[in-house]
């Protein structure tokens, strides 16, 4: 008699046809809420409609239904992203000078937008070189296209159509997985399978396929382009893929196929999988062979990582076990219960993901200039400045979002009854110590960092330069940063024996890469000026963290309002009869944190913009003499507040202020308009609700007098709505002002 172990039952992970597809609800604004569905009595209705349309928690408390809505919405988001990408590639195919740029990227600027003459705005079509007139773009798409081996506008056109097909596919998937085959809650909570697919599938196979594309398509095509071959003469991508002999002419080891791989003779492949470090002197970008090698290595790591977790086969790690075993001598119950939090609260999950993705985005910003990945990116100063600024802003917003969703988790999803002595509970119990210490750190950093500048301004004003903190008087050298630079500069051949150059030219070591007479990158000197501004960075970051963390830790209760959790995530004040309890909701902390995030990022991008123009970017003569854009004035000018105002903001604003009548004039208009949007925000931030309600009532009286009063009763914005409108315009105005200021300046001088 044979006893078989019972076969594991196949789990049914989807519900078929859970929700009927119908367009009826499209005609009922607010169908997700009983109150809003009744239609507008007052103008507050439209604000509530927008506030709650995507707040799925408020539509239903069923976690499975919420999960399905979020999942379906993600496909909609992907569809929009594909549509956007398609538009970018279509502009490259239809309106750009990509092929001309490809033939001479050092003298021709990238342009993919030509303005139509309607009221004379064709003045915006500046001469970007090579006889093409259009708007200079600074997104870095041309450089990415070249790195990926695109040689013609037809290829861009085909890719654009492909992206449209994918956009349609994503829309279909969003409908299908909500209306036809909607996943069950168990599927959303199966974290090990999710890790398997995301690590091994998305990151592992994704990196592997990119590495394959780079080796078989990008490398050979870029090899030809670098040698000056006309793009039209270069074989097409599929010819390299199908014909191994073509590749073997460029990389002889290709003739041996996969034999070296299976015989472990991997060094044969070092022709196209290199470990050089530094930059390619022809293009000023990282060696594409280094990049291919990197993606292959990343693919291996993630393919292994994706197979470490226990799925259908009963071997590997279980995440719950890992978390519950994670206890130290001083951490009580450790991470016990964290698994349940992260599988039942999407806000908790999103908060962690936003915090990590935000930090990663800021890391990307710093690597885009110090290790420029694409050919001819480093010498395109406008694109370099734009990419840095863009990734810094995005990172800042994501990190504030992390705090927002952490606070929503605390208010809506945290259950204090079954949490005792785990790490989260312990943090909450000593939150006063955390916040008061952080507050002390902010005060210390603020007074000392700003105090150094004030000292310098005072000494400068009194004509005592010998008593200033500067590289030529009282030095405050950033010795730790210089030590890190030196360590990295000395690494090749020592701690990184296989490398021929250090990871980034910025570390030091004396070499300089210039392309077409422009500096791509050189060692960046750090001195007293950097020491001062870095402490301003420390100050602004700590204040941002103080505000956001206080919002999270006191989201449910505080000494002032012990029952805060029952008031919800956003509320203006703790009801009538309790003065001094306004601006305490978790939402208000996010609101206030946004302003400090804006401060923090502004100082960073100003520092970057000036430092690069002063000490890195510039032209190089035949004799090897480098002339920087602002002639190295950062070290002596940025050590006073007056210097920042006079030699950075005012001096460099001249291009945007004087742009009228030139192809940069749109930036002049944006500069003006965005200042106006910013100023408009102050009207919402500085006045109270009652002022506007009073005004509205006079206006309604006038309408009644003329018998033109609307049926929907006008109401002033609620306090929270007013703040939301205020902060939105403040940030939008500030960011657009900075954008116009930076681009007009760098396109004119770079």
From Swiss-Prot:
Q: Which reaction does it catalyse?
A: reduced [plastocyanin] + hnu + oxidized [2Fe-2S]-[ferredoxin] = oxidized [plastocyanin] + reduced [2Fe-2S]-[ferredoxin]
Keywords assigned: 4Fe-4S, Chlorophyll, Chloroplast, Chromophore, Electron transport, Iron, Iron-sulfur, Magnesium, Membrane, Metal-binding, Oxidoreductase, Photosynthesis, Photosystem I, Plastid, Thylakoid, Transmembrane, Transmembrane helix, Transport
The source's domain of life comes to: Eukaryota
Residues given in the record as [4Fe-4S] cluster binding sites = 573, 582
Tell me which residues bind phylloquinone. Answer: 692
- According to the record, the signal peptide region is none
Task: Report the GO terms under cellular component.
Answer: chloroplast thylakoid membrane; photosystem I
Q: Where does chlorophyll a bind?
A: 683, 691
Co-factor binding details: P700 is a chlorophyll a/chlorophyll a' dimer, A0 is one or more chlorophyll a, A1 is one or both phylloquinones and FX is a shared 4Fe-4S iron-sulfur center.
Q: What class of enzyme is it?
A: oxidoreductase
Name the family the entry cites. Answer: Belongs to the PsaA/PsaB family.
Subunit organization = The PsaA/B heterodimer binds the P700 chlorophyll special pair and subsequent electron acceptors. PSI consists of a core antenna complex that captures photons, and an electron transfer chain that converts photonic excitation into a charge separation. The eukaryotic PSI reaction center is composed of at least 11 subunits.
For this entry, the protein name equals Photosystem I P700 chlorophyll a apoprotein A1
Name its species. Aethionema grandiflorum
Gene this protein is translated from: psaA
